[in-house]
């Protein structure tokens, strides 16, 4: 019996994260539709969880603030490091 794998596309996950970082209208479109556990790759899930929390708290989202958020959560290394 073969193992069932979840669909995965690293490039698509990275495009979503990139859009959330650079396009102001992206987070409102995905925040209520995507959950961190929908990302196959753990580092992408960690980054998205930080983005989602920051969006819900009304905080500014950019590469520096997300890096700081991941650091505050103790997840910076797991998300790809500094």
Predicted regions and their residues:
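Noncatalytic partner-interaction/assembly domains of nucleic-acid and motor enzyme complexes
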Residues: 1-82
